[in-house]
Swiss-Prot record:
Belongs to the universal ribosomal protein uS19 family. It comes from Synechococcus elongatus (strain ATCC 33912 / PCC 7942 / FACHB-805) (Anacystis nidulans R2). The keyword Nucleotidyltransferase does not apply. This is Small ribosomal subunit protein uS19. SUPFAM superfamilies: Ribosomal protein S19 (SSF54570).
Length: 91
């Protein structure tokens, strides 16, 4: 289910404060966050946000097409190494 329009999008307060502070300075630096559930807002466009994937921080450069999506969508948590080869096929 989608979030109620009355409530608005979820963005972690600490993340929003960091983005607004960098926008006020006009500075571009990597913002490290663990908040994968935060929604990408138009204020974040042009920033690089390092999103935690459970093991490391994955740098995500925010573009206009990402607005409205969650940060966690762009930092995959699982690494797929391929299916195992069938042992009978080798004979």
């Amino acid at each position: 289910m989608a979030r109620s329009l009355k409530k608005g999008p979820f963005v972690a307060d600490h993340l929003l404060r960091k983005v607004e502070k960098l926008n006020a300075k006009g500075d571009k630096q990597v913002i490290k966050t663990w908040s994968r559930a935060s929604t990408i807002l138009p204020q974040m466009i042009g920033h690089t946000i390092a999103v935690h994937n459970g093991r490391q921080h994955v740098p995500v450069y925010v573009t206009e097409q990402m607005v409205g999506h969650k940060l966690g969508e762009f930092a995959p948590t699982r690494t797929f190494r391929g299916h195992t080869k069938d042992k009978k096929a080798g004979r």
